[in-house]
Amino acid sequence: MLNGQWELAEAGNDRLCEVQVPGSVLSGLYGAGKIEDPFYRTNEDVTRELFRKDYEFSRTFVAAEDILKEEKIILVCEGLDTLADIYINGQKAGSADNMHRIWKLDVKEFLHSGENQIRIVFRSVFKYIEAYEYEDNKEIHYVPCGGMKGNQLIRKAHCMFGWDWGPQTIDAGIFRDIYLEAYSHPRIEDVKITQVQGDNAVDVCTTVAVSGDAVDKCQLRVTIQEDAESVCGHRTGANDRKTEAHVCKVGETVSANNNPAVLTSSIHNPKLWWPNGYGDQSLYKVQVELLDEDGTVLETITKRIGLRTLTISQEKDLWGKEFAFCVNGVKIFAMGGNYIPEDCIYSRITPEVQKYLLESCKRANFNCVRVWGGGYYPSDHFYDLCDEMGLIVWQDLMFACNVYDLTEEFEENITKEITENVKRLRHHASLGLWCGNNEMESAWDHWPEVQSESKYLRADYIKMFEYVIPKAVRAADSETFFWQSSPSSGGCFDDSDDENRGDCHYWDVWHGQKPFTDYQKHYFRFCSEFGFQSFPCLKTVESFTEEKDRNIFSRVMENHQKNPAANGKILYYLSENFRYPENFRKLLYVSQILQGMAMKYGVDHWRRHRGRCMGTLYWQINDNWPVASWASIDYFGRWKALHYMAKKFYGPQAVSMCMDGDIMQVYLANESMDAQSYQVAFYVKNMECEILEKLTGTGTVGVQESAPILAVDVSGWEDKKYEIFLEAEVTLADGGVLCDVETLVPYKYLELDKPEITAEVEEQGDAFVIHLKSSCFSPFTAIGFTDADVTLEDNFFHMTDGEEMCVRLDKKDIRNGEIMDAADLTQQMEILTLA
């Protein structure tokens, strides 16, 4: 490994500081105290200008004799950001120009015994963009919202140039592992695993390509067994059943050039992999060993797979063509969100950060995440976690909201990028879909600023996304469904936003400032983007502001709001629904309630129409810096109201209400593989939580069905509409209780009383239990903590009666701080209410 301590300098100048690799210019300078926190106040402006210079990373290392004697010595750079020249002992060994690729250089000729020096010079992307020479009639003028001109010319995460939720941090460096590989024997070049499903058996076909001399004297051994270990610890349910090992000589059963070899293993009584909520996430370990003629193991490659079928169903139906993930023959309703890079400084993206975010998704009952195309391809660890958690990955290729100049060099570069990443990820059980790009087909169809670009650039789009990229993906992975763009109806500019087929992005609520009720006018087959902004909590705002900055229209707050019209939109929707908050903290809190309400309104509607709509992925799950945004989890991992609400509206069973004239309809959505018997109670209550009317019913909702379970005429309450609220309570056969609350007027018109809430904390072994009581109706009650960060079992909940309510806090869910005991928790606890 060449990770560890390196020297950082401006190119050609004296040392600036030490930098830990994986690391970057920003992580090094900030860690050494050479710059302030790039995220604090308006430091983004200073940070951006640093990258008009070139930088170099250097270190020395010892090349041992046992390494030097090998025939091949390969320098492996898993992540170079981005325009890099690599020097060994003063001699140029190679260059890199794509942060999405792994770079491998044969450096044997440059090494000598003893101490060696490696130096990597990162060239300024600004200089590259300024010097770029377009072909005739192909200059690109389009710039994404919040971005920078020329960002699309470089294979670097687009959002590093800025987005409408992210800063222009740019950065450069060695953001993943760097190391030497030395060998003299043949090597495994590629392993591809495919499956053929049969009656109570699965044939696993392992195709292995081997390179090097004396290949014909080598053997391959493939062993498959249930995997009992996870990347997080022991996996339950696996009993380590091994299949028989398969051994053959390379070339015995293969093509004329004796490569690759295909080995087939049959697994009887297989344990299938299912998405979260549908069954177990059973996984199998496939171990491929390359042996010499004496049986000595030369190399071992291990991959983990799930036995399943997974594709997109596009059957024709009453409304057009469905768009639904189909797993093991079962069509599922996708529930999840869009995932962006976890940090602006990519070397700070750790397995722990990824695990926390994905666990938060699973806890909120997600079964799907979309890796958005304006960022980067996450590490193998990310997909291992998705495999274990049952999170289907909609995987965008890294092209988003842009116009590209498809030169020969660019085509070659992206083809290698795609081939490499598809081969790296194709075996994962969670991989559900390859998508060519984000919003680019729709942009050429509908965005005037893109349509005004050269017709030659439009032709480049067609060649790139209708031919070059699909060809590269299918050559490396013929098993996984490919989708040209998102949104799309199937490509070729065939009405890319058609609601009756393909996937849609819906932004009239928010960007179009239409009311939440507008969601009910649309019946998308699959809504892969829709969203609503909110501010982060006060604790997060305090991390990047001084006290004088804490006004949403201050220079600092607007710098941490990258959508120019967003603050006005938040206030517009607030004025439609709530009274103006009395202070800054309350404004942040109410903005989060608005966000959660908006997303709930859309998801509830589309779940009520399961079968016509088969998926909702809201925008967005996470942030890459502290900011006002569409995220449901902020940069520090703090759940906003939306994420707590998603845990309910994405539940395997979810209750919702909607008005149909004078009738309030109560629906129960059941996404589980079992029918659900229920008892339903509908209440009309006053502000003191007294029951004014009650209706009940019983019944059963079928497997993967959404159905109305009660209809109530509420026209008789018109004269009391400012003094009442409506509550639907569903009790399931297993004792689970689901609730939903609605009002007949916006909350701003309700005659809410100021609640008196008492809270007592009890310590119960590995958890604390908070016992709450309210003197009156208290909608969207929120619990916060001054020091520690915590994830509660429930939050932003409605207190609808005088009975005691209990909220659990598991001690393992206490982060970034400490809570010693019940008294300490009580002291740190703060309760926010709407009234």
Predicted feature locations:
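The substrate-binding groove and active-site-proximal loops of carbohydrate-active enzymes
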Residues: 99, 164-167, 274-275, 338-350, ...
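Active-site neighborhood of glycoside hydrolase catalytic domains
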Residues: 388, 405-493, 636
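Substrate-binding clefts and catalytic carboxylate motifs of secreted carbohydrate-active enzymes
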Residues: 10-11, 170-173, 434, 471-474, ...
